[in-house]
């Protein structure tokens, strides 16, 4: 019997030209494609913040996507990840865009 890996959670903040370029919509779509849950929102400081939850391999893929790709018109200058932790179970059921 193979033991299922505990999901992980990580918070992120993306800097650069990430507002007004559909960054949240593309982030939600990529999170859904990878089977992740969490959320994404714009900040008053012009950044995008959020949380990723799911299998560590998929979370790592999403971290690379946030650093290297983003939405087609975005210009990412920096991404900060913090508060990484293992979870007994997922805390979200979907990947949502917060207003």
Swiss-Prot record:
- Ranges of residues in domain Acylphosphatase-like: 9-99
EC number(s) from the headed UniProt entry = 3.6.1.7
Q: Which keywords belong to this entry? A: Hydrolase
InterPro entries documented for this protein: Acylphosphatase, Acylphosphatase-like_dom, Acylphosphatase-like_dom_sf, Acylphosphatase_CS
GO molecular function list: acylphosphatase activity
Signal peptide, first to last residue:
none
Read off the PROSITE patterns from this record: ACYLPHOSPHATASE_1 (PS00150), ACYLPHOSPHATASE_2 (PS00151), ACYLPHOSPHATASE_3 (PS51160)
Catalysed conversion reaction: an acyl phosphate + H2O = a carboxylate + phosphate + H(+)
Write the protein's name: Acylphosphatase-1
Species in which this protein is naturally found: Xenopus laevis (African clawed frog)
**Record lineage:** Eukaryota, Metazoa, Chordata, Craniata, Vertebrata
């Amino acid at each position: 019997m193979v033991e299922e890996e505990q999901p992980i959670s990580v918070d992120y903040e993306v800097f650069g030209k990430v507002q007004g370029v559909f960054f949240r919509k593309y982030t939600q779509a990529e999170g859904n494609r990878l089977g992740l849950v969490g959320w994404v929102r714009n900040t008053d400081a012009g950044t995008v913040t959020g949380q990723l939850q799911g299998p560590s391999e998929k979370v790592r893929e999403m971290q690379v996507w946030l650093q290297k790709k983003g939405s087609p018109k975005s210009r990412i200058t920096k991404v900060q990840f913090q508060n990484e932790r293992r979870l007994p179970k997922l805390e979200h059921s979907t990947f949502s865009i917060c207003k």
